[in-house]
Amino acid sequence: MGFENIWFSHPRKYGQGSRSCRSCANKHGIIRKYGLNICRQCFREYASDIGFKKLD
């Protein structure tokens, strides 16, 4: 039994481990609202490109 078989043998169908950022593959701080599926760091970087505007 190799290393890969031990740690990644459990199916990841739901929960935090099943989702990752679509631009950087990070698993922490995912924004799923409106189907974005990007982490909060990438959201700050790409928010204006996506069409979000900062309100004062």
UniProtKB/Swiss-Prot annotation:
<dbReference type="GO" id="GO:0005791">
    <property type="term" value="C:rough endoplasmic reticulum"/>
</dbReference>
<feature type="binding site">
    <location>
        <position position="42"/>
    </location>
    <ligand>
        <name>Zn(2+)</name>
    </ligand>
</feature>
<dbReference type="GO" id="GO:0005840">
    <property type="term" value="C:ribosome"/>
</dbReference>
<dbReference type="InterPro" id="IPR043140">
    <property type="entry name" value="Ribosomal_uS14_sf"/>
</dbReference>
<keyword id="KW-0256">Endoplasmic reticulum</keyword>
<dbReference type="GO" id="GO:0022627">
    <property type="term" value="C:cytosolic small ribosomal subunit"/>
</dbReference>
<feature type="binding site">
    <location>
        <position position="24"/>
    </location>
    <ligand>
        <name>Zn(2+)</name>
    </ligand>
</feature>
<keyword id="KW-0479">Metal-binding</keyword>
<dbReference type="GO" id="GO:0002181">
    <property type="term" value="P:cytoplasmic translation"/>
</dbReference>
<comment type="similarity">
    <text>Belongs to the universal ribosomal protein uS14 family.</text>
</comment>
<dbReference type="InterPro" id="IPR001209">
    <property type="entry name" value="Ribosomal_uS14"/>
</dbReference>
<dbReference type="InterPro" id="IPR039744">
    <property type="entry name" value="RIbosomal_uS14_euk_arc"/>
</dbReference>
<keyword id="KW-0687">Ribonucleoprotein</keyword>
<keyword id="KW-0862">Zinc</keyword>
<keyword id="KW-0963">Cytoplasm</keyword>
<feature type="binding site">
    <location>
        <position position="39"/>
    </location>
    <ligand>
        <name>Zn(2+)</name>
    </ligand>
</feature>
<keyword id="KW-0689">Ribosomal protein</keyword>
<feature type="binding site">
    <location>
        <position position="21"/>
    </location>
    <ligand>
        <name>Zn(2+)</name>
    </ligand>
</feature>
<dbReference type="GO" id="GO:0003735">
    <property type="term" value="F:structural constituent of ribosome"/>
</dbReference>
<dbReference type="Pfam" id="PF00253">
    <property type="entry name" value="Ribosomal_S14"/>
</dbReference>
<comment type="subunit">
    <text>Component of the 40S small ribosomal subunit.</text>
</comment>
<protein>
    <recommendedName>
        <fullName>Small ribosomal subunit protein uS14</fullName>
    </recommendedName>
</protein>
<dbReference type="InterPro" id="IPR018271">
    <property type="entry name" value="Ribosomal_uS14_CS"/>
</dbReference>
<dbReference type="GO" id="GO:0008270">
    <property type="term" value="F:zinc ion binding"/>
</dbReference>
